[in-house]
């Protein structure tokens, strides 16, 4: 892991603190689809109030790079998916964010890379939903 990059997908309540924690020891690329969020974070502003400006400025630009560009993740060998799992009006989990994040990671995944799901999902989602997406999309690229 010494020369490896860690990719954190989703920079919300879970992903951002995780990215900064890893950035204290490793090179981290934080990815989010929300350009406004990335712009704010690069200015040292975390509107979720999970981190202070000092905490952000300590790692951003040195060991933590923030981006909305998927190809920037291609240097990573470890990916940690931290996207939300909202609940529908019928109280069922909406796996759309997890599926979209899985599809994105699959486009930059290389043989030997590791993917970890930190999102709250029911048992079996990784094996039944995410792994088949990785296999299908990985074989296409």
Provide a role label for each language-model segment.
Residues 22:
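Aromatic pocket-lining residues of Rossmann-like dinucleotide-binding sites
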Residues 15-16:
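N-terminal Rossmann-fold NAD(P) dinucleotide-binding loop
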């Amino acid at each position: 892991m010494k020369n490896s990059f860690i990719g954190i997908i989703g920079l919300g309540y879970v992903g951002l603190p995780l990215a900064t924690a890893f950035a204290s020891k490793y090179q981290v690329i934080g990815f989010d689809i929300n350009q406004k969020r990335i712009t704010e974070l690069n200015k040292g502003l975390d509107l979720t109030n999970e981190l202070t400006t000092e905490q952000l400025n300590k790692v951003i630009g040195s060991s933590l790079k923030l981006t909305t560009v998927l190809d920037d993740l291609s240097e990573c060998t470890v990916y940690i998916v931290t996207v939300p799992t909202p609940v529908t009006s019928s109280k069922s989990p909406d796996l759309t964010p997890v599926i979209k994040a899985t599809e994105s990671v699959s486009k930059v995944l290389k043989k030997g890379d590791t993917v970890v799901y930190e999102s709250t999902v029911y048992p079996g989602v990784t094996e039944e939903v995410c792994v088949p997406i990785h296999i299908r999309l990985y074989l296409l690229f």
